[in-house]
Design a protein with these regions (language model features):
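Conserved N-terminal phosphate-binding loop of PLP-dependent enzymes in the Aspartate aminotransferase
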Residues: 1-126
Length: 126
């Protein structure tokens, strides 16, 4: 049979490729990866209240992305949690009973600690 041919609008686009290379230069020259690793270490300590929360069954972190599995009987947990987070000015990603925290690189330690505290408040009600 015939194969399905699929391509993207920007495949091989010279401007897009140059922009990507410039970003890689910034990552190398400005020490972005090392800075993110240091931030991830600080955030691991700041996230300790989530790791210890009685509703959290599995806390994990990969770099600057954190996730917790939540023990709850709410059948609509993800929808409920998302609404509660928005009400507290948080944009978090619950999928099923797992909540992901993926803050942008520009997040300060104080803002991250506030997000952790607000997430714990929501978990108190779960």
């Amino acid at each position: 049979g015939r194969g399905f041919l699929h391509s993207h609008s920007y495949t091989g686009n010279a401007l897009a490729c140059r922009a990507a290379l410039a970003v890689l230069d910034v990552f190398r020259d400005d020490g972005v990866v090392a800075a993110n690793a240091a931030t991830a270490d600080r955030w691991r300590a700041l996230a300790a209240p989530l790791a210890r929360h009685p509703r959290v069954r599995h806390f994990r972190q990969r770099g600057m992305i954190l996730a917790v599995d939540v023990e709850t009987t709410r059948p609509d947990f993800a929808r409920w949690f998302f609404a509660e987070a928005l009400a507290r000015e948080l944009l978090l990603r619950p999928i099923g009973h797992t909540v992901y925290l993926m803050p942008p690189y520009v997040t300060t330690d104080d803002d991250f600690a506030l997000a952790v505290a607000r997430t714990a408040e929501i978990l108190d009600q779960a």
